[in-house]
A protein has these predicted regions:
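Conserved Rossmann-like nucleotide-cofactor binding loop
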Residues: 41
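N-terminal accessory regions of nucleic-acid-interacting proteins
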Residues: 1-34, 38
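Conserved acidic
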Residues: 26-35, 44-104, 109-373
Length: 373
């Protein structure tokens, strides 16, 4: 089921009963969930003398979900009429706003950016805004940056309000315009796209308490946790105790002097980013590759790291290091004599030439030691 632009007032009558919440910055936000999306067609036409860019793109349908009810339109004029009507009905101002979530806002932004006067647009890269605030109370946010999931994957994260992202029903090779009739399946594809986002945001609202508690990005949850547990701004006693405990821990790991810092720098080694010596300069066929997802946060939880200052350990032997390596981290200078790779085909030799203070007759491949006296 979907609605037309003329059904807006009826939908808002019900949606605006939820009232508004006030953020930490004293901005009032309507407790109404808006999700926006467009479908476009791209095509190529013969360039003119004035315009050498042959690629064109046109919006042929847009959809706006308001608390789970989806309004569909085919033209930008309909969209702008709808936005003006929402502005008037919600009495929007710079201090009283609605949040409109857009999955991959950077794409839609290129189509709507000239329709509004923007107070602030924050981008993480060139043409990659994650939110934009208009002067008349519309705050567009990127739900992809919030979740780090595609729409298909986002539907799998829903626990309470289950909506499936339809896959494969839109043939993107077809050129469609606002005059192109859409089938029921094509319309359902459009509807589900905004319903998935709406359902996810609704679950976030229920989990966080209200709409103002939802952060801008996925890392916002982590930053909030750190602020709550580590940074004290006065007030309740237990928060002061949390801060003191955290502050004491940080001080206990503080680097003691410049020499220790230099030693830590010498011990640090980066990742393997070069080609394996056995295959360098060759063209290989039928190869595959893999990458680790969220590797940094994973190793922060799965691996062990020093949580105390390094202290001198006199008369430390190799056996001591091997025996205690599960409980303690060691930092030391190692002297090796007559070293050679056990497996000459090892693609990742561990010894880095640049970290050696001296090296006798080394055989080096791309900064890694294969053999030395």
């Amino acid at each position: 089921t979907y609605y037309g632009v003329n059904d807006l007032d009826t939908i808002l009558d019900e949606a605006l009963k939820n009232g508004y919440s006030i953020s930490n910055t004293q901005i009032e936000y309507e407790n109404t969930i808006f999700a926006f999306d467009i479908e476009t067609s791209s095509f190529t036409e013969k360039p003119t003398k004035e315009d050498h860019n042959e690629k064109r793109s046109i919006m042929y349908v847009w959809q706006l979900a308001i608390n789970g009810r989806v309004i569909i339109g085919r033209t930008w004029n309909e969209f702008l009429y709808l936005m003006n009507r929402i502005h008037d009905r919600c009495d929007l101002t710079d201090k009283h706003r609605i949040i409109i979530w857009v999955h991959n806002f950077s794409f839609e932004f290129q189509f709507i950016r000239k329709f509004f006067e923007w107070k602030k647009v924050f981008a993480i890269d060139n043409r990659k805004p994650i939110y934009g605030i208009t002067i008349n109370g519309f705050e567009f946010r990127c739900s992809y940056i919030l979740t780090n999931y595609s729409l298909a994957k986002l539907s799998d994260q829903l626990h309470k309000y289950h909506v499936s992202k339809m896959v494969g029903d839109l043939d993107y090779s077809l050129v469609r315009t606002p005059l192109t009739p859409l089938t029921d399946k094509e319309l359902q594809y459009c509807i589900n796209d905004v319903l998935v986002v709406s359902a996810y945001i609704k679950e976030c609202c229920e989990q966080e308490g209200n709409i103002t508690r939802i952060p801008l990005t996925a890392t916002g949850y982590c930053r909030r946790y750190v602020r709550h547990n580590c940074l004290y701004k006065g007030g309740k006693k237990h928060k002061e105790e949390q801060f003191n405990k955290y502050h004491t821990l940080m001080l206990s790991m503080q680097i003691q002097d410049v020499e220790e810092y230099k030693q830590l720098k010498r011990a640090f080694m980066g990742g393997f980013t070069h080609a394996a010596a056995n295959y360098s300069s060759y063209t290989l066929e039928n190869v595959d590759s893999i990458d680790f997802t969220s590797s940094y946060p994973y190793v922060m939880l799965s691996e062990k790291y020093p949580m105390e200052r390094f202290n001198d350990y006199e008369d430390c032997s190799l056996d001591d290091i091997l025996d205690m390596s599960e409980q303690y981290a060691f930092m030391y200078k190692l002297i090796l004599v007559d070293v050679e790779l056990k497996d000459p085909h090892n693609p990742m030799p561990a010894l880095q030439y640049s970290k050696c203070t001296s090296c006798v007759n080394p055989i080096v491949d791309n900064g890694r030691i294969l053999k030395a006296d």
